[in-house]
């Protein structure tokens, strides 16, 4: 993992929100992010993460900017550190179809917060306002600006990828191991050929249209 001075400085620049909030007497800051709002299949997953003060985590960045190998390394470093607190929320395809993806995403985030081992004083949420008893601050593109949100984005992404690999073993014909449920040409062609599986989001327009054709 890159532990160069520039990488450490980059991480330190990403804890500005957290340091500002601590100076305002919000002692415990949790970053919240999700993975899987856009795919045509699989659950939506959220993570809440509280990073320990004064500790540097090289590699923590927006999960979309990291390679799979880098993400896995950072995920392992976060999960193996006893001072890092995190929670995971998973909302099923059935629930997504029932309430819509935005509401399902919020439910996943609330689940993740509830599963934290300690209660935060304030929530930093990537791109969404989350109704909660705990004060909430929405940060646009927060996974690129806040270390806590970036850590949450990595934990959520890695957890969801693991779930999609499990689904791949059940439905190998769709290639979930390659695209994780996103609407690639390979995935769309597989749906056309085999029809939607139980883990496809029937409320999403492309799936809905293909169901109508079938």
Swiss-Prot record:
It comes from Chlamydia pneumoniae. The gene is rnhB. This is Ribonuclease HII. It is found in: Cytoplasm. Its main location: cytoplasm. A divalent metal cation binds at residues 33-34, 126. Endonuclease that specifically degrades the RNA of RNA-DNA hybrids. It is an enzyme of class 3 (hydrolase). GO terms for molecular function: manganese ion binding; RNA binding; RNA-DNA hybrid ribonuclease activity.
